């Protein structure tokens, strides 16, 4: 049986602003759009952490639950919770089969967490994952570099709009969450 997949998640820390955006499309296989308004970006840990997922929906919900438990266990320490989740994800036989990736951020860090055990912090304060991730990443980097007066939210929305114009698995039903200083 084919799974539900494909999305684009984009996150940026820019000019003191922190934003994460995701589209709303859920695709079944390669031919059918099952939902247009899914919410793939969430607020966690007393609204101080943003998390977005790309991949299998059921797998992503499992990871959200595990990550939120790690945040509670480590009192909101994003980096420690991320490393501990990645270690568990990589070493657990059941979790290892999950097909999803997470981007998580707070006001101090922006991180990519993968099932192979990586926890990656970007050099430029921008991350993107999912089927339209490379398009969003390119657009976001260009905007950050050449239109530095834009807010983090404006760049996140524009990056998702660009990805949605190119990637058939990304739509224009964009959800944006922000953290403010």
From Swiss-Prot:
Binding site for Na(+): 164, 167, 170
Single GO MF descriptor: metal ion binding
Swiss-Prot/TrEMBL GO biological process terms: proteolysis involved in protein catabolic process
Domain of life: Bacteria
CDD domains with a match to the protein in the record: protease_HslV
Catalytic activity reported: ATP-dependent cleavage of peptide bonds with broad specificity
Reported regulation of activity: Allosterically activated by HslU binding.
Pfam families per the UniProt record, alphabetical: Proteasome (PF00227)
UniProt entry keywords in alphabetical sequence: Allosteric enzyme, Cytoplasm, Hydrolase, Metal-binding, Protease, Sodium, Threonine protease
Protein's name in the database: ATP-dependent protease subunit HslV
């Amino acid at each position: 049986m084919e799974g539900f997949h494909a999305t684009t998640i984009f996150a940026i820390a820019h000019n003191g602003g922190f934003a994460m955006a995701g589209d709303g499309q859920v695709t079944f296989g390669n031919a059918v759009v099952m939902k247009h308004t899914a919410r793939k970006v969430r607020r966690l840990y007393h609204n101080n952490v943003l998390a977005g997922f790309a991949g299998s929906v059921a797998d992503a919900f499992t990871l959200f639950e595990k990550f939120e438990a790690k945040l509670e266990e480590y009192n909101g320490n994003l980096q420690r919770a991320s490393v501990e989740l990645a270690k568990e994800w990589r070493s657990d036989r059941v979790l290892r089969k999950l097909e999803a990736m997470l981007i998580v951020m707070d006001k101090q860090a922006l991180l990519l967490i993968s099932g192979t055990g990586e926890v990656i912090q970007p050099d430029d304060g921008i991350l993107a994952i999912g089927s339209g991730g490379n398009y969003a990443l390119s657009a976001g980097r260009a905007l950050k570099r050449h239109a530095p007066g834009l807010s983090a939210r404006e760049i996140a929305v524009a990056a998702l709009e660009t990805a949605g114009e190119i990637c058939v698995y990304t739509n224009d039903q964009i959800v944006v969450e922000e953290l403010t200083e």
